[in-house]
UniProtKB/Swiss-Prot annotation:
Entries under Pfam families matching the protein: Methyltransf_25
Function, in words: Catalyzes the conversion of S-adenosyl-L-methionine (SAM) to carboxy-S-adenosyl-L-methionine (Cx-SAM).
Protein name as annotated: Carboxy-S-adenosyl-L-methionine synthase
Species of origin: Haemophilus influenzae (strain ATCC 51907 / DSM 11121 / KW20 / Rd)
Record keyword Secreted present: no
Taxonomic superkingdom: Bacteria
Keywords: S-adenosyl-L-methionine, Transferase
């Protein structure tokens, strides 16, 4: 695993965070050391796939990055005639994802596409995964995507939505942000790295509250919506059609 040192030295002109070649190269290390509970979420996606994925259906991993969630789901699917479609708009991520998937043998076919998830059709889905992806979409585009997912899911299909959250209570919000930064420092990131990455993400990652997510998912039509995992200001929800 290549170590993430992208923000370890001062950057004079710090632009917006993008999922380019450099990020794709270090992404597994970056997300492991940056997102509390990431491994637990990836493991549980497999457990949820085992329960929810049905025969003759599709599984979508929207914003699949290097394929961790796709592989976890595939390892746990025991139904026939299932296809997994992974989509990411970063060509470097897609290339590494294809290599990663190809390294593991399975009878379940996986197709990895380089595309904008807003432009991809969702159909005959028993499971859709949005693992730390929705937060990077413009807020005005989120309902349309979730509506498309809901309409493309079969009855009793599941959406797994993992996100960084913000909290309405200012003190709690600041506390959880501070704890997250402490988590990153404990994982070897310096103050400079934490600060520069935070600045780079400011304009591209816009977080919602847990309540905002719940209300939006119910308004779209999901019958059951619940937070199943949280660590500091990161977590994951399930929404069942």
């Amino acid at each position: 695993m290549v170590k993430d040192t992208l923000f370890s030295t001062p950057i004079a002109k710090l632009g917006d965070f993008i999922f380019d070649e450099n990020v794709a190269e270090v992404f597994p290390d970056m997300i492991q050391r940056s997102v509390p509970g990431y491994s637990n979420i990836i493991t549980a996606i497999g457990m949820l796939a085992e329960r929810f994925v049905t025969a003759d259906s599709n599984v979508y991993d929207l914003g699949c990055s290097r394929g961790a969630a796709t592989l976890s789901a595939r390892r746990n699917i025991n139904q026939p005639n299932v296809k997994i479609i992974g989509i990411d708009n970063s060509q470097p991520m897609v290339e590494r994802c294809r290599q990663h998937i190809a390294a593991y043998h399975s009878e379940i076919p996986v197709e990895i596409l380089c595309n904008d998830i807003r432009h991809v059709e969702i159909k005959n889905a028993s499971m859709v995964i949005l693992n730390f992806t929705l937060q990077f979409l413009p807020p005005e585009d989120r309902i349309a995507l979730l509506t498309k997912i809901y309409e493309g899911l079969n009855p009793n299909g599941v959406l797994v939505l993992s996100e960084k959250f913000r909290f309405e209570d200012t003190k709690i919000n600041h506390l959880l942000i501070d704890l997250h930064h402490q988590f990153k420092r404990a994982n070897g990131y310096s103050e400079l790295e934490v600060s520069q990455k935070r600045t780079a993400l400011e304009n591209v990652m816009r977080t919602d509250s847990i309540e905002t997510h719940k209300v939006r998912l119910k308004n779209v039509g999901f019958s059951q919506v619940e937070l199943w995992f949280q660590c500091f200001n990161f977590g994951s929800m399930i929404a069942v059609k």
